[in-house]
Amino acid sequence: MYLDIFKVAKERSIPVIYTLHDFYSICPSVKLFNKETFLCNYANTAGCGSCIAKTFNLNINFIPLWRKEFYENLKTVKKIIVPSYSTKNIFLNTYKDLTIEVVEHGYDKINGKPNNDNPDKKKNKKFNIAFIGYITEEKGLKYLEELTEKVKGTDINVHLFGQTTNKKCNKNKKNYVYHGKYIQQDLPNLLLENDIKLICLLSMWPETYSYTLSESLISEIPVISFDLGAIAERVKKADVGWILPINSTLDDIFKLISTIKSAPQEYKQKVERIRHLLKNMKSLKDMGNEYTEIYLSLIHI
């Protein structure tokens, strides 16, 4: 991103509203991801040198200058918009006195009745869990890899709707079903047809919102996630899933899944909370109206 646009807007007295969807203005790595601690120690810029060297093959810690330049420009905008409070907190921990407003993303429900007549579903006595989306290292690939081995010979099946960076996960094996790419509007049907009971959103970076969580909830399926970022924030707020401590082990995750499987009453309560949440779920139109109101408040016409 070129910062000149802030300067030009200021020179011409053009009010700026800046919407942030990632952490690029804090670090060009974008996600503040550390494979050991999940969220990196972004507040300590002195420790950024080793990460910069590894990520960008540069032997200079440019993060203090990067943030100085961004801060000077961000101070000139009228308002900054982010999609979650966890994201807002990370930015305010970095840039103390910015004006930041939270506007959550909207999401439209899928029209049409799901197909509940899959004969394979009726025969299925397994507890089906799923990963959805493109699963990379920071999206929890290692947990997908480990769980597919852990569930072999059990009454738990793991499904992947989407793809991974590990080609070995892009094929079926015992207790593991690879579905591959999907069309977004088809996902609720696919999840229902395959009797998915739980979705694993085991992202290892502090996601700023998570559309995959929205897709899970629209499908009326509870989730498990780590206590990190917007996913945990949203799950806790509506009580629509279960939260794991950061750096939980495979055994911890498998134990939680087994506990959920054995607690149908608690599971039913989570589903009911999801249904209650969906009654007032923000649509894309609602989100657009929020943005329109914010922009019109700064436009004097």
Locations of regions flagged by a protein language model:
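Conserved small/polar residues in nucleotide/adenosyl-binding loops
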Residues: 299-301
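Membrane-proximal helix-turn-helix segments that form the acceptor-binding/catalytic region
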Residues: 11, 41-79
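Nucleotide-activated donor-binding/catalytic signature segment of Leloir-type glycosyltransferases, i.e.
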Residues: 165-194
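A charged, aromatic-enriched C-terminal amphipathic alpha-helix characteristic of glycosyltransferases
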Residues: 251-252, 265-296
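Helix-loop-beta element that forms the nucleotide-linked donor phosphate-binding surface
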Residues: 71-79, 88-107
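Conserved donor-binding/catalytic core segment of Leloir-type glycosyltransferases
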Residues: 81, 122-139, 145-148
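Short hydrophobic beta-strand element within catalytic cores of glycosyltransferases
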Residues: 198-201, 222-225
